[in-house]
């Protein structure tokens, strides 16, 4: 009887939700990667004053359009942590919009590694989900992915 109860206890432990703990490097930073379209962002987050450095340049210089900076700051707004963390990241591939989306994804993941209790609000906002939409490939016999060549009946 005792071994049956112990096996049931083992099953109930296996079915519990995973416990998320801090994942920090030796410098006290949380590291994560974010992806969007063809862009990949490597992100390091640590407590600070809210500075964001992208490819060794301030975010205001790298992302000149305000809407892109708004996209990058969305995870901090959703978690109510504006100005609480410094971000250092390298971004490569894709265009500016894809890079901003990759940075948003990476910042969100790094925040959950630093503060696991933020996982709920960030997941509810959709920041932890990898946006899988990519450009549709061009097909032969067509002008673009879906557009056909001009057709003349006569």
From Swiss-Prot:
InterPro entries: Ribosomal_Su5_D2-typ_SF, Ribosomal_uS9, Ribosomal_uS9_bac/plastid, Ribosomal_uS9_CS, Ribsml_uS5_D2-typ_fold_subgr. GO terms for biological process: translation. Gene3D superfamilies: 3.30.230.10. Pfam families: Ribosomal_S9 (PF00380). One of its GO terms (cellular component) is cytosolic small ribosomal subunit. Keywords: Ribonucleoprotein, Ribosomal protein. One of its GO terms (molecular function) is RNA binding. Belongs to the universal ribosomal protein uS9 family. HAMAP family: Ribosomal_uS9_B. This is Small ribosomal subunit protein uS9. It comes from Azorhizobium caulinodans (strain ATCC 43989 / DSM 5975 / JCM 20966 / LMG 6465 / NBRC 14845 / NCIMB 13405 / ORS 571). The lineage of its organism: Bacteria, Pseudomonadati, Pseudomonadota, Alphaproteobacteria, Hyphomicrobiales.
């Amino acid at each position: 009887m005792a071994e049956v109860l112990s096996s049931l206890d083992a099953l109930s432990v296996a079915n519990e939700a995973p416990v998320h703990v801090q994942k920090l490097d030796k410098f006290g930073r949380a590291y994560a990667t974010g992806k969007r379209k063809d862009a990949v962002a490597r992100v390091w987050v640590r407590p600070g004053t809210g500075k964001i450095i992208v490819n060794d340049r301030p975010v205001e210089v790298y992302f000149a359009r305000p809407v892109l900076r708004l996209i990058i700051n969305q995870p901090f707004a959703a978690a109510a942590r504006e100005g609480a963390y410094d971000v250092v990241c390298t971004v490569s591939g894709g265009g500016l919009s894809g890079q901003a989306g990759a940075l948003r994804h990476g910042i969100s993941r790094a925040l959950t590694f630093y503060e696991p209790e933020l996982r709920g609000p960030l997941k509810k906002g959709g920041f932890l989900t990898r946006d899988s939409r990519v450009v549709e490939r061009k097909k032969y016999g067509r002008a673009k992915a879906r557009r056909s060549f001009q057709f003349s009946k006569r």
